[in-house]
Amino acid sequence: MHKKLKISVKFFKLLLLILLLNNNANSQYLVSCNFLNSSSSSLLSGATGLVLDFDVDMYKMTYNTINTQGIPTIATGAFCIPANTTCKNFPFAIYNHGTSLRKDNVPSYNNIEALIGKVFSAGGYFVCMPDYIGMGDSPGLHPYVHAETEATAAIDMVRAAREYLANNTSFMDNGETFITGYSQGGHACMATHKYIQDQNLTNEFNVIASAPCSGPYDLSGIMADTIISPTPYSNPGYIVYLLASYQLAYGNIFSSWSDVLYPPFDTIVSPFFSGNNTSLDMSLLNSLIPNDMSLLIRDTCMNNFMNDSVNMNHPWWVALLENDNYDWLPTAPIRMYYCTGDEQIAYTNALNAEAAMNNNGALDVQAVNVGNGNHGNCVLPALSAAFNWFQTLKTPCDFTNSKDVSKLNTQISPNPFKEKIMIESSEIIDIEIFSPVGKSIYFNSNIKDFRIETSSWPKGVYIVKTQSGKNLHSSILIKN
């Protein structure tokens, strides 16, 4: 019992044997999580042709996050858990959905795109599908293609999901995180991955890989070219959505729609961006406004924008540059799946990102062509490729170690924690606590009830091993 507990490097690389504590933790992110429906693996496999091992339960989650001004707000999303299995240790996957104007056309309302998250979950993942702020039951207008809040909506949902698992289930978060998304969700995927790395959150979110699909990563290049180009654009509603979003986020894009759009389009678009739209969709908006940007956007606005293409000090340029996410140096692998026939989001977004990242010194970044389909037809091959790639990288569930790991009558609280953790045990135990990178930061033996000061510990996910005799208990603690 006095000998220091042993733990292998593989344990930390794979984070097996992690049992989320079943105690009454204080939820800092989770507001509610309510069951919606169940789906069988056979149904999901038949719809996709993928090999899927697990049935899936889907929940509607409401959680705390922040808006574009950093002010607390709520967001919603769909949360999927593998069901009817003795396996308990799964990685997290984040699926970011595509463009939607209707607040109710989102995963938490069980829309068609929610099927994608169910499929990933059936492959063995806890899946978070954020609706994004301003969508679902979140108040106000959605800040479309706003990188920071796309990221925080996803990150805070995973935090809320961890709280739910810890307090309501016996499932284990195995410490791995995978991120994907399609269309706008591709941008959100890239934004989330970049934010985790930029904000030094890798201890809390161990990103194994990300797979952005058909996304607009190069806003200041390719999207700007779309605005300026005389070539008609198939989805002019995207441009209007972008203007509305960045006006919400930055407040300096326009004063009123009539300042930036010609009549009658200035009055036509307004109801689509009221902040409570549940009936007007993108296809309707595209049908009501011209595909030629010179007929939609006033000459004065367009000329001011075009004439500043070198210095890029115009508010539109500043906003686009702020939300670019193609030119950075990822430390985890990325695959950007695309189709060459995409009429909505130019596949050169992926090529530009691949070139920029590799030029920056990235070790494992590729843009992958999955066919010549259009934007709609690219969904299945792109996301199937992402799924199959993730399956080669994730840690398989350890069915043996998922059983009989909670024989010790020991409680550790609170979880999540901040300044201290309390250990209460009915028997003498040894305890060792490890940082997310595998470093032992605390060890004590032959103890029972005691307190550990944790104020100096950084935020992240900590692994706790307790042992009494031959009984070993592995668990996870989260510091927020």
Model-based region annotation:
Residues 1, 26, 405-480:
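C-terminal outer-membrane/trafficking sorting elements
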Residues 160-232:
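Primarily recognizes the serine-hydrolase "nucleophile elbow" in alpha/beta-hydrolase
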Residues 144-167:
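Alpha/beta-hydrolase active-site loop
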Residues 27-86:
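Catalytic-loop region of hydrolases
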Residues 336-342:
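Short beta-strand/loop motif that positions the catalytic acidic residue
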Residues 224, 317-319, 323, 344, ...:
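C-terminal catalytic histidine-bearing segment of alpha/beta-hydrolase fold enzymes
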Residues 69-72, 83-119:
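Short, surface-exposed "cap/lid" segments of acyl-processing enzymes
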Residues 213-327:
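Accessory cap/linker subdomain of secreted extracellular hydrolases
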